[in-house]
Amino acid sequence: MEINKLNARILSKFGESGAVFGVGALELVKDYPELLILSADMSMVAGLERFKNTYPDHFFNTGIAEQNLIGMSAGLVSENRKVVVVAQACFISMRSFEQIRQYCGYMKFPLIIVGINAGFSLTFMGNTHYAIEDMGIIRCIPGMTIISPSDAGQALKAFYASWTLNKPVYIRFTGGLNCPVIYEQEFNYQIGKGIRLREGNQIQIIATGSMVDRALKAAKILEEKGISVDVVDMHTIKPLDTDILKKDVKLVVSVEEHSIIGGLG
């Protein structure tokens, strides 16, 4: 799908997970019958209801049992199925660490693990549902790619790109429905290559996920005060694009909905 102003706003209403599973997965399964989606009781929350009802043989709900979810998914991958795993970011990263470490880090099974409601998306449920350590936890596992999309359109592109990568990937989604639109026209997306959204020579703001929108708003305020700001959308946390950071500025600021330890910062 090419991004334009109209579909960018439609995808925004779905949210990142809704765009991926309500649009992307429905398209992929037509060409890739080996696609399976396993969920820890997240079909409604993740926007999977349409996929589940349309392709019931391609969807399995393991219940709220994240360790079992990864184990079952790994078994299916060993039988040449392509598996997408969906669960809350806080639980899939912490409860399933040993299983992800074993099957993705050491056995190199190319699971696509999607952690929804990352960051502070579920603050109303208390700190048990915060996910501000998930990238740091998974980042230390060998061979993992970590992606943090900034809007729903980019989430869709990240999902498609992960599909062809044939490596274990963790994609974290922050925010919910009606997420801010960063990209209103088609753009080049490549895993491991950050995107410069604004050119500047005094301050560089490097942001990821939901904080990209905040970074752009901050840059606009600073520009009005005569301060030149460079803004980078660092959608891939691992591998990190160090080339885009090579800019002569006076101050570099990182912004993320995650601990700076093990995250972008």
Each model region followed by its residue ranges:
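Thiamine diphosphate
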Residues: 1-172, 177, 188, ...
